[in-house]
C-alpha cells in the first residue's frame, strides 16, 4: 500500500509514504494535481517553470519521477498555468490523459499514450485573467468530457464557465451559458451513468 503527497510550492516535494521520491527547487515550481493510470504509472502537473507546463511521470510505482522536457510538450502561452483548487486538473480514461490549464489562456493538453506524446486543444471557457479558466476536468469515456471553472473572484458569474466535448477534447462547446452554477472547482462523472 502506497500513499502519495504532493506539495505545491518551491521547493516542490513528492512523497511516497514518508520518502521523498521527487524534489524540484526551481523558484517557480508549483504543482497542482496528480493521478495514476495504473499501479505502475502516474503523472503530476504543475505551472510552467520554463515555456511549458511542468509534467512529471513515474513508470515504476512512484519510486522515481522524471520531468518531461519542454521539447516534448506544447508551449505554454503567456500567463497560462493550472489551479490547485481540487486536484482534478487531470482526467484519465485508459491510456488517454487530459490536463486542464487556466489563467490568461485555458486549454487542454492531451496524450493518447500515457504521456509519451502531447497535443493541445483550444477551449471557449472564460479566460484572459490570472483567476479565470478551467479549474476541473473529467471524462466519462474516451470521447465525452466536461470541464468547469470560471473566475473565483466572481463566484456568481455564469458566462462561459461550463464546457463539454463529445470528440475526446478536440472541440468544446459552452453549455448552460448564463445559467447556474457559477464558479466551481470540481466536476466528476458518476460511473455507469452513461455520462448523464
Where are these regions (language model features)?
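Loop/turn-rich, solvent-exposed surfaces of beta-rich toroidal or solenoidal domains
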Residues: 150, 156, 176-196
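Oxyanion-binding "anion nests"
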Residues: 132-164
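Entry beta-strands of beta-propeller and related beta-repeat scaffolds
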Residues: 1-2, 40-44, 96-98, 143-147, ...
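Signature of short aromatic-glycine-proline-rich micro-motifs recurring in repeat-based ectodomains
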Residues: 82-90, 134-136
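Short glycine/acidic-enriched loop and turn motifs that connect beta-strands
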Residues: 8-9, 48-52, 104-106, 152-155
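Repeated scaffold domains used in trafficking and secretory/extracellular systems
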Residues: 28-35, 131-136, 183-188
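Asp-box/BNR beta-propeller loop motif
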Residues: 6-26, 55-76, 109-127, 157-179
Amino acid at each position: 500500500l502506497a500513499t502519495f503527497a504532493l506539495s505545491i510550492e518551491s521547493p516542490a516535494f513528492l512523497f511516497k509514504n514518508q520518502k521523498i521520491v521527487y524534489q524540484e527547487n526551481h523558484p517557480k515550481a508549483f504543482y497542482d494535481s496528480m493521478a495514476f493510470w495504473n499501479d505502475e504509472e502516474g503523472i503530476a502537473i504543475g505551472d510552467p517553470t520554463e515555456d511549458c507546463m511542468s509534467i512529471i511521470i513515474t513508470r515504476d510505482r512512484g519510486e522515481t519521477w522524471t520531468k518531461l522536457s519542454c521539447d516534448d510538450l506544447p508551449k505554454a502561452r503567456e500567463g497560462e498555468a493550472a489551479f490547485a483548487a481540487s486536484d482534478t486538473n487531470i482526467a484519465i480514461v485508459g491510456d488517454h490523459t487530459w490536463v486542464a490549464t487556466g489563467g490568461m489562456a485555458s486549454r487542454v493538453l492531451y496524450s493518447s499514450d500515457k504521456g509519451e506524446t502531447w497535443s493541445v486543444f483550444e477551449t471557449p471557457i472564460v479566460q484572459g485573467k490570472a483567476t479565470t479558466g478551467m479549474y476541473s476536468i473529467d471524462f466519462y469515456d474516451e470521447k465525452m468530457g466536461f470541464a468547469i471553472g470560471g473566475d473565483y473572484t466572481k463566484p456568481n458569474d455564469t458566462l462561459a464557465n461550463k464546457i463539454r466535448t463529445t470528440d475526446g477534447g478536440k472541440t468544446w462547446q459552452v453549455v448552460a451559458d448564463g445559467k447556474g452554477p457559477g464558479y466551481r472547482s470540481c466536476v466528476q462523472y458518476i460511473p455507469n451513468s452513461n455520462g448523464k
